[in-house]
Swiss-Prot record:
This is Probable peptidoglycan glycosyltransferase FtsW. It comes from Halomonas elongata (strain ATCC 33173 / DSM 2581 / NBRC 15536 / NCIMB 2198 / 1H9). It is a multi-pass membrane protein. Coiled coil: none annotated. InterPro entries: Cell_cycle_FtsW-rel_CS, FtsW, FtsW/RodA. The keyword Manganese does not apply.
Amino acid sequence: MSRLARLREQLSTRDHFCDGWLLVATLSLMLIGWVMVTSASTEVATSLTGNPWYFSVRHGVFVLCSMVVALLVLRIPMAWWKANGPLLLLVGLALLALVLVAGREVNGSRRWLSVPGIPLNLQASEIAKLCLIVYLAGYLERFLPQVRRHWGAFLRPLMVMAVMGVLLIFEPDYGAVVVMTGCVMGMLLMAGAPWGRFLLLMGLVAALGAALAIAEPYRMARLTSFVDPWADQFASGYQLTQALIAFGRGEWFGTGLGNSVQKLFYLPEAHTDFVFAVLAEELGMIGAVAVIGLFALLVWRAMAVGRRAELAKRPFAAYLCYGIALVIGAQAFINIAVSTGMLPTKGLTLPLLSYGGSSLVISAVMVGMLLRVDIETRQARRREQPAAPRTGEARS
């Protein structure tokens, strides 16, 4: 056996209870997120509340609650999610409609629902993402041949996404629209839908996006500031230029944990949407690449869990894993791309890292579902394998 083969055997989690690398990536990102939220929020917390650890303590509570919720989700069989997919979709749509009526407005967007007695604002779009994935996974299991052959079955989930998209645009939450649309199209593509349909739909989506951008002056301002943020660095390009300064200050190894200058009221949303810029400033390019590597590991293992489920003839579980991997991967990519100036500002959190209870809890729920799929698949595989004969029986 070669060295590479031995190393792969040592790193393999094939005979373990669950995918250990998925757990390592998730827990590492949550821990790094807590540390970075603490570092990035001390000055803002002092200014707003007089307590420098206000956001750190709250985020720590969110982390603990997320772990508890993930453990509870781990006990729910996939059969329950499969049976309740349509109901969960209705819950997601109801929350998106409710937030337009009774939602709390922050920075011009009505995205949050206040829950009496709980110091947590629920972000409706985060719950809707999960509900949509569960519904679509069940839909693909039931109508997979029709999705591959007929336009009607192919367009049905896209029509559901269109309804959600309209509700999200009214909030507005364009970042969630992009992530959820990409997730739906990605799941349909992985289910074997023809490429030609995607090319046509991508053209239509691009045309619609251009029309929406032109319709509102502030959207055009975001696009132009993204192309050249330095042209208006104290107005429309301010947030992006400050993020780029943070990346530049970090260089290779960073300024050191807690030594960020940009978090001192220069970079808005330093502990939420732009926490990755503060991370790059304090931990440098090495730290930033390491975090990107952890996200890549998480998405890879989620896809691997889905592939094992697909090979075990468990299509619902497989498509659920693919959808979760697409959502986490797309949201992480967009957030990092926005921070580095590759994409216009979207207002998306960085999963498992950014401050925010709803995002963290839903991300933990998704990981709990991945682990549940993995455990069920491994148990099914062990049941199918013939039991090894006992020593006495082997001799006889």
